[in-house]
Amino acid sequence: MTKDELKALGWDRCDVVIVSGDAYVDHPSFGVAIIGRVLEKAGFRVGIIAQPDVTDKTSFSRLGEPRLCFCVTSGNVDSMVNNYTANKRLRSDDDYSPGNRPHMRPDRAVTVYCNKIRETYKTIPIITGGLEASLRRFAHYDYWDDKVRQSILADAPADMIVYGMGEKTIVDVVGRLKNGERIADITDIRGTTYKTRKIGDLSDFIELPDFKAVSTDKRAFAEAFKTFYDEQDPYYGHTLVQRHPKTIIVQNPPALPLTTAEMDAIYDLPYTRYPHPSYKEDIPALRTVRFSITSHRGCFGGCAFCAITAHQGRMIQSRSQESILREIRALTKLPEFKGTISDIGGPTADMYMLGCSKRSTQGMCRDKLCLYPEPCPNLNKDHSRLITLLNEVRKVPGVKNVFIGSGIRYDLAMQDEQYLYHICRQNVSGQLKVAPEHVSRNVTDAMCKPSIEAYDKFVSKYREINKELGKEQYIIPYFISAHPGCTLKDAIQLAEYVRDMGYYVEQVQDFTPTPSTLSTCMYYTGYNPYTGQEVYVPKSVEERRMYRALLQYKNPENYDLVKKALISANRKDLIGYGQNCLIKPVRPAIYKKPGRRKP
């Protein structure tokens, strides 16, 4: 956005300027678009500075000083995850930048952006939000520095974090700024974290071990994490406090979950679903979500490696069927729409309108998970409203196909055979994404995932249903390598399972320790904070590379690593010419595509 655009709107200045590490796309899958539209709906003038040049001071002042505040986010993804691979190598592309160009955002973008803003504007309130700020709101282990870092509020000259999804919270905060309150006095809004020098007025709070303790004592870190994790419930979560060397971090309880009407109001806003017209190149991240629909937020799966618990929460917040149908009718009018809805879902597709009766009054259970180790008997597993929704979407003129691109939680789907039949009949595009993640019980327990036996039962039922329907449809399983709890023996067990599946696995993700997840706590401390038991953690680069190579043992480029792993584990029985062998005794030739000769 430029000052010329402000003039075209008849504005002399903005009320709020949002600074983002992503290119600007006016689509509800992009957080900046949602926050901007919500603030606009509330009557505020909102400007957006997307991917500012941090070497040019004027990049942050091109819209002038906003009347109320700057809002700062790294974008949809943590900037360190966006910039580096799981093995800390610099990425060569960026899906959230025009033309897939890398290096359009700095490392630790939120901190850098806040510093740049403060260089020019000494007193303007700076509010941070999004994944990077939310998940770094307390002292946290940083994989890229391999150390415990302070809260992002202690490192950056920001005044507040609006953590979680944040729509209601940011409107409340900006509204109070408009009414003349100082940002330092706004300390009572749910879903915010702020810094202070004293906590004398606070009551009913829990104090976490301080920064010095958690940065020098791994047991203290695990204790702090467990308390933090357990208190992320909007109904029983307490205010949390953590002392840092020069400040005190205070997190208010999480925001209450949005009602269906509130969800509808957010997604009914007039998103264009296009990038800003100034871009001459495509934004790759838009391709996969252009014709997708968000039906709900939150996930009660509780996977240890996933940040959704700390960001969106475990409670499902669903839109109404009418709101979803309105969005789809609007979507069909876009000239690029060819009749296919690529996805209707959320973090996982099959939790729409699900939950249990106690959650809306008492919160989620403290001492157990909804799906691990088995689905809870109190959980509503009836997918009938989702089935009705999928059927109604197919009736919308112009819609030819409705697919589930976000994947399903297979152990939940197994609780409702009618749903499984329905998606196999109408909503699978030929391949269904599911995530068993691993086969070893050591690892699936550390992940809080069901056993591989549950996955095998699902595969059997899926094949049975497709055979009955006369369809040839497949499963794309997703696996994680080098997760805490995984030993070399476990990695080989997974490789043997992949061998027995009979087809090559491409969907392999190296475990990346991201802030504020249970898995990251185990990675750093070597302990499970809930049991106190030690957890084996594969940390060396070579070991992590071996574990991944074992999963893709058919790739000739992985031969040396696979052979080394098998010899190290005393599994030479898997080297040979037998049908159960992973590799042959002789290294295969590596095919290289012929390159173009230099002129």
UniProtKB/Swiss-Prot annotation:
The lineage of its organism: Archaea, Methanobacteriati, Methanobacteriota, Stenosarchaea group, Methanomicrobia. Residues 281-557 form the Radical SAM core domain. [4Fe-4S] cluster binds at C299, C303, C306. Keywords: 4Fe-4S, Iron, Iron-sulfur, Metal-binding, S-adenosyl-L-methionine. GO terms for molecular function: 4 iron, 4 sulfur cluster binding; catalytic activity; iron ion binding. InterPro entries: Elp3/MiaA/NifB-like_rSAM, rSAM, rSAM_horseshoe, UPF0313, UPF0313_C, UPF0313_N. Pfam families: DUF3362, Radical_SAM_N. Belongs to the UPF0313 family. Binds 1 [4Fe-4S] cluster. The cluster is coordinated with 3 cysteines and an exchangeable S-adenosyl-L-methionine. Gene3D superfamilies: tm_1862 like domain (3.80.30.20). This is UPF0313 protein UNCMA_01890. SMART domains: Elp3. Its cofactor is [4Fe-4S] cluster.
